[in-house]
Amino acid sequence: MEASRVKPGFNGVGMAAGSVNGSSRRPGPGLGYGYGYYMGSGAAAGGSGRAAQAPVDGCSVALRVFVVASTLVSAVVMGVDRQTRTIQITITDALPPLEVPLTANWSYSSAFVYFVVANAMVCLFSAAALAACRSRAAMVPVMVGDLLALALLYSAVGAAAEFGILGERGNSHVRWAKVCNVYGRFCDRAMAAVIVSLIGAFANLVLLMLNILTIHKSSSYY
């Protein structure tokens, strides 16, 4: 009778061994104790590390580099733009014309100063965003910054272009004479800087649209 109580597979040694083996198999990764628990925590840590890094899109990186380069070139070209010309002023017909050196400088125009500052700020922001392109937590702040940078660039381009057109054509209503016929090189450089900055602003717009599309695709609500 005593021997029948300790049959293998029932309340005896076999059942105890089976229970031990079963307990060692049941705690899966991250669910039980011992080795399975540590493996689970390691996998979770690896998953969290991978989740903290966003996948890098080659097209977005290329656009970001182009925005950095275009805004840097625009700020530098406009920042060094100046030209000095000697203007002949006739006081009376009896006297020879008076030669006066006059200088056109970008710092004389508030629109051009705003243009240089705006492009420099966007260049610095885009460089910082390029350095943080692998951080998933920085996606939304960078997207908001891109939106502000886009508004800043377009406003600066509009202000500089309006002042450039005024120098190219003048304004007959207020009797403002055109000056680009005298300072041709100055106006050409300013217009080149405005065009490059406008192309950079368009690239920033495309980049912002790509970021919005990426967040839309990765959202769990859609």
From Swiss-Prot:
<comment type="subunit">
    <text>Homodimer and heterodimers.</text>
</comment>
<feature type="transmembrane region" description="Helical">
    <location>
        <begin position="60"/>
        <end position="80"/>
    </location>
</feature>
<feature type="topological domain" description="Extracellular">
    <location>
        <begin position="168"/>
        <end position="189"/>
    </location>
</feature>
<feature type="topological domain" description="Extracellular">
    <location>
        <begin position="81"/>
        <end position="110"/>
    </location>
</feature>
<keyword id="KW-0325">Glycoprotein</keyword>
<keyword id="KW-0812">Transmembrane</keyword>
<keyword id="KW-1003">Cell membrane</keyword>
<dbReference type="InterPro" id="IPR044173">
    <property type="entry name" value="CASPL"/>
</dbReference>
<dbReference type="InterPro" id="IPR006459">
    <property type="entry name" value="CASP/CASPL"/>
</dbReference>
<feature type="transmembrane region" description="Helical">
    <location>
        <begin position="147"/>
        <end position="167"/>
    </location>
</feature>
<keyword id="KW-0472">Membrane</keyword>
<feature type="transmembrane region" description="Helical">
    <location>
        <begin position="190"/>
        <end position="210"/>
    </location>
</feature>
<protein>
    <recommendedName>
        <fullName>CASP-like protein 1E1</fullName>
    </recommendedName>
</protein>
<comment type="similarity">
    <text>Belongs to the Casparian strip membrane proteins (CASP) family.</text>
</comment>
<keyword id="KW-1133">Transmembrane helix</keyword>
<dbReference type="GO" id="GO:0005886">
    <property type="term" value="C:plasma membrane"/>
</dbReference>
<feature type="topological domain" description="Cytoplasmic">
    <location>
        <begin position="1"/>
        <end position="59"/>
    </location>
</feature>
<dbReference type="Pfam" id="PF04535">
    <property type="entry name" value="CASP_dom"/>
</dbReference>
<feature type="glycosylation site" description="N-linked (GlcNAc...) asparagine">
    <location>
        <position position="105"/>
    </location>
</feature>
<feature type="topological domain" description="Cytoplasmic">
    <location>
        <begin position="132"/>
        <end position="146"/>
    </location>
</feature>
<feature type="transmembrane region" description="Helical">
    <location>
        <begin position="111"/>
        <end position="131"/>
    </location>
</feature>
<feature type="topological domain" description="Cytoplasmic">
    <location>
        <begin position="211"/>
        <end position="222"/>
    </location>
</feature>
<dbReference type="InterPro" id="IPR006702">
    <property type="entry name" value="CASP_dom"/>
</dbReference>
